[in-house]
């Protein structure tokens, strides 16, 4: 059986030759060079991903939502009852939540995965990959053992790879877990080196008078657990959560297949920071869907070197932003594959890099 280290070593590099060919192809399309802006850059990025074989395209689409509870909820860092995690996960199986509606609009399947919900029995309709009934309270103990973190990473990587074998070429990640912006902020603070007060936000409408406590909880968690910012697994195990581990696993699994993965919001940025510490080779496969309204979002994205495509003032999580951005990926593929070429037309644009065809 493959180990986590074995799988991390399988992540292929982006193909620069394929990207150069894509650049030449796009420059020859029926438009001024560069006039489709970031859509062009996105198409070129996709062309470099080995899993797409040099031609940007979208097959099946999947949003994987990692659901888990967090022991740190006990510290008063969230206003919603912990039971909401399980209730909302059940709602996802009925297709009535935000991510389900947006994914259906995008033609994507939603996979609701229990990686650590705190219920006595598994919830019917969920994919059961639970490793524990919620993580430890990071304010007083590690979130989990390194062994559990590595086990869940490996399980999710393998599951993601199976979906790829069955035709999924575009992945999105999502999260569900009460109080999970607290461990996410702890991860962002640890890896970026920024102070907790710079990255801790209100999450799911935490009253501002409770924000100081949340900041203190994050600071205590980091001081107590001493996560190594250079070791992504260590950070996830000490101050993360099972949903964050699961999202990192999707990113690593998709990248190991040479396929793109759409990030969602703040939770996914934190998971991406940890995943990139495990394997910097995954970064070109990460596509930032939107700018989360959560405090600390820009800090995390800046550290990742990513610029989101949308700014919708969203902070729902669930994978809602990833689902919303899927048509942008399809649009980039469409211009690459379906636009006409200048060489086959009567239009000549010598040295024209800025004007549009009507100027």
Curated annotation (Swiss-Prot):
User: What does the record give as the function of this protein?
Assistant: Catalyzes the synthesis of alpha-ribazole-5'-phosphate from nicotinate mononucleotide (NAMN) and 5,6-dimethylbenzimidazole (DMB).
NCBIfam families for this protein:
cobT_DBIPRT, PRK00105.1
Task: Describe its assembly.
Answer: Homodimer.
Task: Give the GO molecular function terms.
Answer: nicotinate-nucleotide-dimethylbenzimidazole phosphoribosyltransferase activity
Active site residues according to the UniProt entry: 318 (proton acceptor)
- One Pfam family in the UniProt entry: DBI_PRT
- The molecule here is called Nicotinate-nucleotide--dimethylbenzimidazole phosphoribosyltransferase
What top-level class of enzyme does the UniProt entry assign?
transferase
Q: Which GO terms describe its biological process?
A: cobalamin biosynthetic process
* Family membership noted in the UniProt record: Belongs to the CobT family.
Reactions it catalyzes: 5,6-dimethylbenzimidazole + nicotinate beta-D-ribonucleotide = alpha-ribazole 5'-phosphate + nicotinate + H(+)
PANTHER family reported for this sequence: NICOTINATE-NUCLEOTIDE--DIMETHYLBENZIMIDAZOLE PHOSPHORIBOSYLTRANSFERASE
What are the entry keywords?
A: Cobalamin biosynthesis, Glycosyltransferase, Transferase
Associated pathway? Nucleoside biosynthesis; alpha-ribazole biosynthesis; alpha-ribazole from 5,6-dimethylbenzimidazole: step 1/2
As recorded in UniProt, its EC number(s) are: 2.4.2.21
């Amino acid at each position: 059986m493959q180990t986590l280290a074995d799988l991390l070593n399988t992540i292929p590099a982006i193909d620069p030759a394929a990207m150069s060919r894509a650049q030449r192809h796009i420059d020859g399309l029926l438009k001024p060079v560069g006039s489709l802006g970031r859509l062009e850059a996105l198409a070129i990025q996709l062309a470099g991903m080995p899993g797409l074989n040099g031609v940007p395209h979208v097959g099946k689409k999947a949003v994987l939502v990692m659901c888990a509870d967090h022991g740190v909820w006990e510290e008063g860092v969230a206003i919603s009852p912990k039971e909401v995690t399980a209730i909302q996960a059940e709602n996802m199986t009925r297709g009535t939540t935000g991510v389900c509606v947006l994914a259906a609009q995008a033609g994507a399947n939603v996979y609701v995965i229990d990686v650590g919900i705190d219920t006595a029995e598994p919830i019917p309709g969920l994919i059961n990959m639970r490793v524990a009934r919620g993580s430890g309270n990071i304010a007083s103990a590690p979130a989990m053992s390194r062994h559990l973190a590595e086990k869940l990473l490996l399980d999710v990587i393998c599951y993601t790879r199976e979906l790829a074998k069955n035709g999924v070429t575009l992945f999105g990640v999502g999260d569900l877990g009460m109080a999970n912006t607290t461990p996410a902020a702890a991860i962002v603070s640890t890896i970026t080196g920024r102070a907790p007060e710079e990255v801790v936000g209100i999450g799911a409408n935490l009253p501002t008078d409770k924000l100081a406590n949340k900041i203190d909880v994050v600071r205590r968690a980091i001081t107590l657990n001493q996560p190594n910012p250079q070791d992504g697994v260590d950070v996830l195990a000490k101050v993360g959560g099972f949903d964050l581990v699961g999202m990192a696993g999707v990113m690593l699994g998709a990248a190991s297949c040479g396929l793109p993965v759409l990030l969602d919001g703040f939770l996914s940025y934190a998971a991406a920071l940890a995943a990139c510490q495990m394997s910097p080779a995954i970064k070109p496969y990460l596509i930032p869907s939107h700018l989360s309204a959560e405090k600390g979002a820009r800090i995390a994205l800046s550290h990742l070197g990513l610029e989101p495509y949308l700014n919708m003032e969203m902070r729902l999580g669930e994978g809602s932003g990833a689902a919303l951005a899927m048509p942008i990926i399809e649009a980039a593929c469409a211009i690459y594959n379906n636009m006409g070429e200048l060489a086959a037309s009567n239009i000549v644009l010598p040295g024209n890099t800025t004007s549009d065809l009507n100027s």
